[in-house]
């Protein structure tokens, strides 16, 4: 009887140990998962990024992805143009000013107060309504169209149709980049002006004879991109500077970035963004460039 009791006690004790061990292991896994979850959401804060509409789609998508991993960070992305972005980040009314141009190029901006974070490169190209029946122009012809010297598509081998120029607003970095590369100081013809790449794309698509220019990320099969001097507007040609109309995409902060803003900007330069998202959305990674450009527009080999 005693022997049976002892065996029963031993078995009961062993069972108790197994239960306690199981509970202990279960608690460790839960604690580990909890710690991991907590660490992924320790970054918190509110970020407002305003400016370039050329850069806007990339920042919007990156912000969405970043917030999935950092649920305590709230990011608002808006357009308005590069000039607006630079002015507002200088005034500290926004966290980040998105721009297609260097701060040094914008009158009224003290670039010494701002910190430049280059996150991508964007190519830009003339685009026409498909009805114009034009696919290639010389750089001189492009200049003559946007300065008003050429007013009919038949004069450059296209349809007998009046040219309707659609320009960007004066605060646009896309416009500044295009005019620096193409007009080179010449006065643009008076024409309608639009505030965003998206609006321009829709107008060119729907208006017979229309011509404008767009960031590569906005060019689709509903408009006709124009080759210049038989050079196609491609990423590869931008990377080597064979295609001359391109700019860096800047995300400026007022002083040094910190907290959630610094972490988001680090994410913008991560492999996840630079090797995947950038290309998927029609931009060019800053790491793929074989040349570099300064604020004066001087291009040199890297």
Pin down the residues of each PLM region:
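Bacterial N-terminal signal peptides that target proteins for export
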Residues: 1-10
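Hydrophobic helical h-region of N-terminal Sec-dependent signal peptides
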Residues: 11-17
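C-terminal motif of bacterial Sec signal peptides marking the signal peptidase cleavage site
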Residues: 18-22
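Exported/periplasmic ABC-transporter solute-binding proteins
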Residues: 24-70, 74, 80-83, 87-90, ...
């Amino acid at each position: 009887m005693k022997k049976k009791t002892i065996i029963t006690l031993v078995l009961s004790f062993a069972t108790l140990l197994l239960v306690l061990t199981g509970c202990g292991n279960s608690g460790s896994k839960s604690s580990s998962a909890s710690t991991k979850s907590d660490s992924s959401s320790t970054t918190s804060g509110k970020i407002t990024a305003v400016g370039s509409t050329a850069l806007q789609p990339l920042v919007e998508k990156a912000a969405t992805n970043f917030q999935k991993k950092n649920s305590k960070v709230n990011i608002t992305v808006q357009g308005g143009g590069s000039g607006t972005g630079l002015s507002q980040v200088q005034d500290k009314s926004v966290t980040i000013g998105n721009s297609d141009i260097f701060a040094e190029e914008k009158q009224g901006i003290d670039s010494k107060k701002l910190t430049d974070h280059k996150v991508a490169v964007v190519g830009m190209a003339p685009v026409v309504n498909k009805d114009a029946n034009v696919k290639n122009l010389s750089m001189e012809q492009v200049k003559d169209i946007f300065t008003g010297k050429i007013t009919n598509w038949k004069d450059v081998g296209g349809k007998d149709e009046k040219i309707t120029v659609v320009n960007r607003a004066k605060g646009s970095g896309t416009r500044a980049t295009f005019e620096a590369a193409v007009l080179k100081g010449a006065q643009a013809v008076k024409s309608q002006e639009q505030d965003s790449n998206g609006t321009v794309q829709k107008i060119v698509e729907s208006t017979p004879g229309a011509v404008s220019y767009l960031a590569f990320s906005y060019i689709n099969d509903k408009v006709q991109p124009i080759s210049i001097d038989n050079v196609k507007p491609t990423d590869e040609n931008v990377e080597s500077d064979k295609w001359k109309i391109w700019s860096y995409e800047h995300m400026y902060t007022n002083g040094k970035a910190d907290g959630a803003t610094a972490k988001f900007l680090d994410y913008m330069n991560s492999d996840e963004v630079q090797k995947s998202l950038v290309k998927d959305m029609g931009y060019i990674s800053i790491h793929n460039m074989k040349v570099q450009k300064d604020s004066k527009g001087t291009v040199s080999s890297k």
